[in-house]
Amino acid sequence: MQALSARAPRVAAKPVSRSGARSAVTVVCKATTVRSEVAKKVAMLSTLPATLAAHPAFALVDERMNGDGTGRPFGVNDPVLGWVLLGVFGTMWAIWFIGQKDLGDFEDADDGLKL
């Protein structure tokens, strides 16, 4: 009687891969159990109290920080930064507005499709 083995057969030599040849694709199937799913959920839920307890510490903002998440508009904590944002936006809009005048009025549906 022949004995059954759970091991995969071994190959003596390594396969040679050529520069143009594709490597073999291996497929692995794993069975998940209810116990492993429950363990993942318990581990995730165990971090929730620590996260909720430390939540006020995440809201501390220093003047050296940039103001993200502090309720300030666009994260601007210095008035000069607001003027810079407004100036850059206004300059880009003015360049676009002046440049689009040369493109025409686009009354025909196919006007914008010319290359």
Swiss-Prot record:
Protein name per UniProt: Photosystem II reaction center W protein, chloroplastic
Encoding gene (name): psbW
Entry coiled-coil feature ranges: none
Domain of life: Eukaryota
PANTHER family xrefs: PHOTOSYSTEM II REACTION CENTER W PROTEIN, CHLOROPLASTIC
Transit peptide region: 1-30, 31-59
Species assigned in the record: Chlamydomonas reinhardtii
Role this protein plays: Stabilizes dimeric photosystem II (PSII). In its absence there is a reduction of monomeric PSII.
Gene Ontology, cellular component aspect: chloroplast thylakoid membrane; photosystem II
